[in-house]
């Protein structure tokens, strides 16, 4: 994982799977290569292998279960996503919560497998406790802003600044800001406030011109880095 971090969560929009999902992955890859920026995509579990075999950018799962291998019908384990070609996974997204004991077990196994991990939290007070588990990054997202088009950068900047204070208590863990990120200006502000990057979904997955939106994101991130 490299700063600036831009993580695109495909979720399960119409543009996230099948031919359209693959096209979206290639659009993201094109922007990443043209701007020399590492952009991570979190794709549906059924798309991991197909996408990972088609692009050179990091492909993540959107969720993993902390259950052991064995009789767990429908579970998505760290071993399964590794075998499918994923480089890492989101954990504990507000739309896919996991129990603390399962998350801890999943993290330990992901580390053994060499997989990156992004723990999602809904408030800054949880940033330091989750960072102590030593994931690759912690993503803070106020759930009330997710998918609204109202960015955390503008509506709740104190969430980012407080999260920055919390992440500094633990060395070696990145901080990602998310929820309502829709423009390069949102990305710029989030990073100027101290985050290492942003997470986004609907702003790109539902965009008429996703390449244009993503380029705007990257330009905002680069501008913030240049001014640090």
Curated annotation (Swiss-Prot):
The answer to keyword Cytoplasm applying to this record is yes
Residues in coiled coil: none
Q: State the active site.
A: 93 (electrophile), 141 (proton acceptor)
- Provide the alphabetized UniProt keywords: Cytoplasm, Gluconeogenesis, Glycolysis, Isomerase
The record's subcellular locations are:
Cytoplasm
Which GO terms are recorded in the biological process aspect for this UniProt protein?
A: gluconeogenesis; glyceraldehyde-3-phosphate biosynthetic process; glycerol catabolic process; glycolytic process
Please give one Gene Ontology molecular function term for this protein: triose-phosphate isomerase activity
Cite the EC number: 5.3.1.1
Q: What Pfam families would the database entry show? A: TIM (PF00121)
Q: What class of enzyme is it?
A: isomerase
Gene3D superfamilies reported for this sequence: Aldolase class I
| Gene Ontology, cellular component aspect | cytosol
Extract the SUPFAM superfamilies matched here.
Answer: Triosephosphate isomerase (TIM)
Pathway it acts in?
A: Carbohydrate biosynthesis; gluconeogenesis; Carbohydrate degradation; glycolysis; D-glyceraldehyde 3-phosphate from glycerone phosphate: step 1/1
Query: Which residues bind substrate per the record?
Result: 9-11, 146, 180, 201-202
Q: Which reaction does it catalyse?
A: D-glyceraldehyde 3-phosphate = dihydroxyacetone phosphate
Q: Which InterPro entries does UniProt cross-reference here?
A: Aldolase_TIM, TIM_sf, Triosephosphate_isomerase, Triosephosphate_isomerase_arc
User: What function is annotated for this protein?
Assistant: Involved in the gluconeogenesis. Catalyzes stereospecifically the conversion of dihydroxyacetone phosphate (DHAP) to D-glyceraldehyde-3-phosphate (G3P).
On assembly, the entry states: Homotetramer; dimer of dimers.
The entry's family comment says:
Belongs to the triosephosphate isomerase family.
Q: What is this protein called?
A: Triosephosphate isomerase
The organism is Metallosphaera sedula (strain ATCC 51363 / DSM 5348 / JCM 9185 / NBRC 15509 / TH2)
Q: Which gene encodes it?
A: tpiA
């Amino acid at each position: 994982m490299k700063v600036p971090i831009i993580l695109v969560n495909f979720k399960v929009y119409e543009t996230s799977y099948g031919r359209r999902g693959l096209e979206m992955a290639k659009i993201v890859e094109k922007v990443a290569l043209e701007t020399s920026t590492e952009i991570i995509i979190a794709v549906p579990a059924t798309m991991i292998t197909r996408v990972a075999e088609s692009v050179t950018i990091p492909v993540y799962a959107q969720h993993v279960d902390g259950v052991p291998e064995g009789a767990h019908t429908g579970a998505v384990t760290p071993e399964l996503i590794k075998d499918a070609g994923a480089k890492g996974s989101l954990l504990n997204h507000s739309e896919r919560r996991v129990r603390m004991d399962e998350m801890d077990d999943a993290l330990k196994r992901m580390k053994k497998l060499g997989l990156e991990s992004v723990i999602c939290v809904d408030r800054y007070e949880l940033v330091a406790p989750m960072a102590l588990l030593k994931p690759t990054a912690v993503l803070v997202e106020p759930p009330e802003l997710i998918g609204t088009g109202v960015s955390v950068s503008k509506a709740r900047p104190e969430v980012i600044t407080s999260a920055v204070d919390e992440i500094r208590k633990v060395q070696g863990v990145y901080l990602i800001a998310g929820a309502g990120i829709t423009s390069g200006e949102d990305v710029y502000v989030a990073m100027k406030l101290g985050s290492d990057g942003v997470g986004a979904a609907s702003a790109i997955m539902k965009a008429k011109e996703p390449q244009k939106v993503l380029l705007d994101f990257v330009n905002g991130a680069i501008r913030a880095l240049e001014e640090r």
